[in-house]
Amino acid sequence: MVEFKEYISEMNRRLKKYFPESNSLTPAEEGVFKALDIFRVPKKEADEQRYKAIKYAFKHHYENNSFYRKFCKENNVTPDDIKSIKDFNKIPLVPDQFFKTYPSGKEFAMWLATVYTGDLPSIVVKRNDDYDDIINKFNEAGLVISYSSGTSGRHTFIPRDKRTFYDAEYMIAKAVITMVYPFWEYDSYGYLLMPNPFKTNVFAGKVCGAYFDAVKDIQVAMDRELKADLIQAAMKNNLKGRIIRYAMQRENKKMIDRIINWMREHYKNGDKISFIGAPFILYFVMEELEKNGEYFDFGENGAIVTGGGWKIFEDRRISVEEFRKKAEKILGIPQENCLDLYGMVEGNGFMVQCPEGHYLHIPNTCYQAMVIDENGEEVAEGEKGRFAFLDGLAMSYPGFIISGDEVRMYEECPVCDRPTPVLEPEVKRAAGSEMRGCAEEMRRVLAMDMGGGNA
């Protein structure tokens, strides 16, 4: 078996383009790029690194983002007040709903400039430009603006500079490759169960770009341009929405057939394969296989990393555990090789389940996770509350955010010996919060009538 150090060294060689210049690493980047195993940094060392990372990011946004500085002044907090990790609860948190409160047209560009830390590049906005037109103009000028969670008809827009986005892409790749050790190797085949990163501004697709550098041959489930207005139209229950859904339904049947044929080919050849992305797509593939009495036994040659979206239909959820058992039964992929990942468009820290107990491990060298009650106070260990985080990697927008997700957090994993805090395996939306996440959004757009039920 390959040594872990050699394994990560090979990964870094493949992902070289994502590295910032070594003489200009921020403290958060040091915690991600320099750590050999981001989930096994000793607690004292991780705490010191995280303090430096969050303090640096907070000072940066306080000094360079006038909107956030005003927010801090309203809360009577300055960077000088953050003297230790114990002071992190003083850092003002931005509600995730804030990133949905934008106007359209030229005012949308001005809203992005308000959220953005630093100076946005200048672009020319035309009268008929939609959100994607404006985003693409900014992205051509050097940014990587992406969006998610249009499930209420309002997307979450996050403006990243290229460096912050590269940090996010590297972080997600390193977190996954570390957790599946020793499974990963470049000479293998992958299937991305998300939109093509190079044809969409949907975050969950776009952030998977490193998959194409880490694995030699990748196929994409949704290999077409996917724009904000199409997603919104498909979710509306009018004639246009129904026509779009009907066209997508026909395309989805072909998509399932393509994935099954791909599996047959690589199973026959004894190839190593991986799936990354929305679980509901693979769920429908497995349903089709089971219906036809077809089973595979990929064993250690197969791995699955899912990203949220555990509603299969509007009236049916599947549990993470149920999904793992189904993958083991139909694809022959061991449950240890079937991991879930938790992340969001607003953040650059990604939590991946450990193979031993399937708890979500938090990358604690650059990312402070918190669980808070309705009054903004931290709850006791293991109690349910809202997930909030301080993201040291976010340099182009203030990544100090309270989400609408309900979680339980523990200081250490009850099953494995990795020294990071963990979240319980299932993350749910808090009562009164809309269903969020790119996988849920893709389900709403694409899963309509794929075997029953309505989205």
Q: Language-model features: where?
A:
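Ser/Thr-glycine-rich phosphate-binding loops at phosphate-binding pockets of nucleotides
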Residues: 145-155, 344-347, 403
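Conserved AMP-binding/adenylate-forming
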Residues: 302, 310-413
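Adenylate-forming
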Residues: 282-297
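Long, K/E/R/D-enriched contiguous segments that form extended
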Residues: 269, 298-299
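Nucleotide 5′-phosphate-binding alpha/beta core
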Residues: 1-147, 154-205, 217-249, 253-274, ...
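Short, aromatic/basic amphipathic alpha-helical patches
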Residues: 201-216, 289, 318-325
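Conserved ATP-binding/catalytic segment of the ANL
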Residues: 388-455
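Short His-Asn-centered micro-motif
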Residues: 160, 193-195, 273-281, 306-309, ...
